[in-house]
Amino acid sequence: MSVLRAVLVQDMARALLLAAAAFVLTLIIGGWWVRFARRHKLGKRIRPDGPQSHLVKVGTPTMGGIMIVSTVLILTILFNLVDRWSMLLPLGVMVSFAVLGAIDDWLSLTGSRSKTHGFTVRFKFWIMMAVAFVASLALYLPQPYGLEHEGLVQIPFVGEVNIGLWFIPIAVLIIVFISNAVNITDGLDSLAGWNLTLAFGAYGVITFLAEPRLTNLMAFCFTVVGACAAFLWYNAYPAQVFMGDLGALALGATLAVVALQSQQWLLLPVIGIVFVVEALSTMIQTGYFKWTKWRYGEGRRIFKMAPLHHHFELLGWSQPQVTQRFVLIGTVAAMVGISLALIFGPPATGLQVDQPGIIVIEGDGSR
């Protein structure tokens, strides 16, 4: 037990130190980025049909996700590439979606004054699908070409199940959906940042308690937690900088990959309930509007405005009220997700870690 406790303390201490380092580094990069973005007028355009209270945000610096992505990239490369395959995958997905989001942000900043978007929705969707497909293959293929998950998933009351090749299309849809869901949620100051902090924190705990222990993935999650927490320093109401597609798409896709790597992706709708509900509200609103326009000749709406946070704004809630209440929901959801992982996860048989050179203690002996 002394060996077990020593390794657990060492792993958690390493993860928390990376979180603290990420917080400090992101604060430094963030201060520089806010000044740089203001100097070069990298200000966000606000949709004219949105809530009128948002018009005061016109010109607020955007693409703030660069401070999170760059911090995670630097610290992971320096301190958390022990098991290269398991870390290169979330890093690769993060960078790929960040580049896509950065180009989209840049096009929206430099395009026609009458437009607020960069890429067309269809073009961006197919690029995201392509990157997600490559990531899903990397998860499914055997080593050394992939991580050899072979479609494994933890199902409550059932245990570990191999869903075979079905894993690939499911993983693609999860990555694309969660990436867009986070992007949709990023419409109020600190709303996406807070819920990303909670979600990555939850998966950090889940991977720490997993069998075998996914210690590198845990350290990665807490690195993102520290970076997101520091981003909130600049994104708290009233925001000095917005995350932009650069950050929202990248962090959403990375969260999905982390969930898939942990084999606890069925818990993602629970842990990321705010993201899921925000995305579904937009899909329901759009679908219902199109159907009623076809059926009755005029489009009708279920919500006052989509996504859902705008609906509550138009009901009279202030922006801080919407954010705080959604964050409270996200906090409870994260706790429920961790509890479900503990209840329905595989039984602990001893100590296993994914780092080479560590003693492994199992139920049938040690090696």
Swiss-Prot record:
Pfam families: Glycos_transf_4 (PF00953). GO terms for biological process: cell division; cell wall macromolecule biosynthetic process; cell wall organization; peptidoglycan biosynthetic process; regulation of cell shape. GO terms for cellular component: plasma membrane. Its main location: membrane. It comes from the Bacteria. It is a multi-pass membrane protein. Signal peptide: none annotated. It is an enzyme of class 2 (transferase). InterPro entries: Glycosyl_transferase_4, PNAcMuramoyl-5peptid_Trfase, PNAcMuramoyl-5peptid_Trfase_CS. Its cofactor is Mg(2+). It is found in: Cell membrane. GO terms for molecular function: metal ion binding; phospho-N-acetylmuramoyl-pentapeptide-transferase activity; phosphotransferase activity, for other substituted phosphate groups; UDP-N-acetylmuramoyl-L-alanyl-D-glutamyl-meso-2,6-diaminopimelyl-D-alanyl-D-alanine:undecaprenyl-phosphate transferase activity. Pathway: Cell wall biogenesis; peptidoglycan biosynthesis. It catalyses: UDP-N-acetyl-alpha-D-muramoyl-L-alanyl-gamma-D-glutamyl-meso-2,6-diaminopimeloyl-D-alanyl-D-alanine + di-trans,octa-cis-undecaprenyl phosphate = di-trans,octa-cis-undecaprenyl diphospho-N-acetyl-alpha-D-muramoyl-L-alanyl-D-glutamyl-meso-2,6-diaminopimeloyl-D-alanyl-D-alanine + UMP. Its EC number is 2.7.8.13. Keywords: Cell cycle, Cell division, Cell membrane, Cell shape, Cell wall biogenesis/degradation, Magnesium, Membrane, Metal-binding, Peptidoglycan synthesis, Transferase, Transmembrane, Transmembrane helix. The chain crosses the membrane at residues 16-36, 62-82, 87-107, 125-145, 158-178, 190-210, 214-234, 240-260, 264-284, 326-346. PANTHER family: PHOSPHO-N-ACETYLMURAMOYL-PENTAPEPTIDE-TRANSFERASE, PHOSPHO-N-ACETYLMURAMOYL-PENTAPEPTIDE-TRANSFERASE HOMOLOG. Catalyzes the initial step of the lipid cycle reactions in the biosynthesis of the cell wall peptidoglycan: transfers peptidoglycan precursor phospho-MurNAc-pentapeptide from UDP-MurNAc-pentapeptide onto the lipid carrier undecaprenyl phosphate, yielding undecaprenyl-pyrophosphoryl-MurNAc-pentapeptide, known as lipid I. Belongs to the glycosyltransferase 4 family. MraY subfamily. This is Phospho-N-acetylmuramoyl-pentapeptide-transferase. It comes from Chloroflexus aurantiacus (strain ATCC 29366 / DSM 635 / J-10-fl).
